[in-house]
């Protein structure tokens, strides 16, 4: 998804977490 680099690090392991940082 499209998010700041900081959030991407958390999403890298799995897009499943992206739902938490998808807003920003």
Swiss-Prot record:
Where in this protein does the record put region Disordered? Answer: 1-24
The protein's PTM annotation reads: Binds 4 heme groups per subunit.
Residue ranges of the TM segments: none
Q: Which domain of life is it from?
A: Bacteria
Q: Name one GO molecular function term.
A: metal ion binding
Listed GO cellular component terms?
periplasmic space
Which keywords belong to this entry?
Electron transport, Heme, Iron, Metal-binding, Periplasm, Sulfate respiration, Transport
What compartments host this protein? Periplasm
Task: Report the principal subcellular site.
Answer: periplasm
The processes (GO biological process) annotated in the record are: anaerobic respiration
Instruction: Please describe what this protein does.
Output: Participates in sulfate respiration coupled with phosphorylation by transferring electrons from the enzyme dehydrogenase to ferredoxin.
Q: What is this protein called?
A: Cytochrome c3-2
Q: Which organism is it from?
A: Nitratidesulfovibrio vulgaris
